[in-house]
Amino acid sequence: MKIKKGDLVQVITGKDKGKQGKVIVAYPAQDRVLVEGVNRVKKHTKAGQTARGSQTGGIVTTEAPIHVSNVQLVVEKDGNKVVTRVGYRFDDEGNKIRVAKRTGEDI
């Protein structure tokens, strides 16, 4: 997967189109990422016992994973944020390096 934990990404489609956020968790097996402040959903929780004591019921707002095809990486060039695709190249030792396709710089 070309998007990693800690990357700054922008949502390119859906209800949160145009929003930017940091990737909190990447789920490569499902091709999904959890982005900070994006795809917020409301979960209804039931009151009950937890390991730390009683939990009150109610509605909790939290982020839900979004498919990796719906986000693009944001890199900074000359003080401006640029949305770009991600490519790969190999260095002299054979290590795989991520490259911003629009700027040509290593990530």
UniProtKB/Swiss-Prot annotation:
Example of a GO MF term: structural constituent of ribosome
Stretches of the chain forming a coiled coil according to its record: none
Gene Ontology biological process terms in this record: translation
Gene3D superfamilies according to UniProt: 2.30.30.30
Record flagged with keyword Ribonucleoprotein: yes
Function: One of two assembly initiator proteins, it binds directly to the 5'-end of the 23S rRNA, where it nucleates assembly of the 50S subunit. One of the proteins that surrounds the polypeptide exit tunnel on the outside of the subunit.
Protein name: Large ribosomal subunit protein uL24
Biological source species: Streptomyces griseus subsp. griseus (strain JCM 4626 / CBS 651.72 / NBRC 13350 / KCC S-0626 / ISP 5235)
Name of the coding gene: rplX
